[in-house]
């Protein structure tokens, strides 16, 4: 195989509750992950000398610290292969926006090189490796909408509705440590069952919420303003720790109408929700997971 070009899709946190804090400082979460049909694109070309090269350079990110390079080297080490790769990144997803771009790029790298280098490690092992790179990487490896607990690594596949979304990036990054380290962050939301979470989004509208929103509003008046503006069209929310915001909509036409009204000072796009990752679709992967229905069991 000479070359692979694959998507690294965005994700949304359709809801995000912080239910505790561990002794090691990590936060215990409950969240619903869903993919979007908007992606970065990575191009992989094998090399025989074992070198890992990534281009173009990303401002303020050291080459060797980039999650893409780290994922490639992790896979080399775990498999014992001496193969290398040239990687070209076409970046479309904003950095620091809560869309999971870096984690998704890392997951795409793991799956691409598993295929390109003929390693056949399997999704469970690749997800295990991905977790050492970041808590969001496993859901991108497994490739299905999921209910997540723990620090985000305990995953149960689910089937969600797949509306159109308008996503707004107000133009700034929100540092995750600034949010999770904020003294006013809610850290004691009572845990709920997965089935209740799934029913809540369908039956109660605004029942899906993001516990990070209040802190992000304090940290960024621009995000607060954009969120208030988008909320006029539906149940707008923050994804992850921000700064991207999203609003589920009933039709692409409605999304187009909203996009025409977005000010030029905000970057915005429309995307469709997906239950199966565009990466898995591109690779023809059919995971062994058996998702629950949209509303779950009682």
UniProtKB/Swiss-Prot annotation:
This is 4-diphosphocytidyl-2-C-methyl-D-erythritol kinase. GO terms for molecular function: 4-(cytidine 5'-diphospho)-2-C-methyl-D-erythritol kinase activity; ATP binding. It comes from Chromohalobacter salexigens (strain ATCC BAA-138 / DSM 3043 / CIP 106854 / NCIMB 13768 / 1H11). ATP binds at residues 94-104. The keyword Transferase applies. Pathway: Isoprenoid biosynthesis; isopentenyl diphosphate biosynthesis via DXP pathway; isopentenyl diphosphate from 1-deoxy-D-xylulose 5-phosphate: step 3/6. Its EC number is 2.7.1.148. It is an enzyme of class 2 (transferase).
């Amino acid at each position: 195989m000479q070359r692979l070009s694959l998507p690294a899709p965005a994700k949304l946190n359709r809801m995000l509750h912080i239910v505790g804090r561990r002794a090691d400082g990590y936060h215990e979460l409950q969240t619903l992950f869903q993919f979007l049909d908007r992606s970065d694109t990575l191009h992989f070309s094998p090399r025989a000398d074992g070198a890992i090269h990534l281009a173009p350079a990303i401002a303020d990110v050291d080459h060797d610290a980039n999650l893409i390079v780290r994922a490639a080297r992790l896979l080399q080490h775990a498999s014992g292969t001496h193969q290398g790769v040239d990687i070209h990144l076409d970046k479309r997803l904003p950095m620091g926006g809560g869309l999971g771009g870096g984690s998704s790029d890392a997951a795409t790298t793991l799956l691409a090189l598993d295929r390109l280098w003929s390693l056949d490690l399997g999704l469970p092992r690749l997800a295990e490796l991905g977790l050492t790179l970041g808590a969001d990487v496993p859901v991108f490896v497994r490739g299905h909408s999921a209910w997540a607990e723990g620090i985000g690594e305990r995953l149960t596949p689910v089937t969600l509705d797949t509306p159109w979304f308008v996503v707004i990036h107000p133009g700034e990054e929100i540092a995750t440590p600034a949010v999770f380290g904020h003294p006013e962050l809610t850290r004691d939301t009572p845990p709920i069952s997965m089935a209740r979470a799934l029913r809540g989004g369908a039956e109660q509208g605004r029942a899906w919420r993001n516990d990070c929103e209040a802190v992000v509003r304090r940290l960024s008046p621009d995000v607060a303003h954009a969120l208030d503006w988008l909320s006029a069209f539906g149940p707008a929310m923050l994804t992850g720790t921000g700064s991207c915001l999203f609003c589920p909509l009933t039709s692409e036409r409605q999304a187009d109408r909203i996009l025409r009204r977005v000010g030029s000072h905000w970057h915005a796009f429309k995307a469709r929700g997906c239950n199966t990752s565009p990466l898995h679709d591109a690779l023809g992967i059919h995971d062994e997971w058996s998702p629950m229905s949209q509303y779950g069991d009682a």
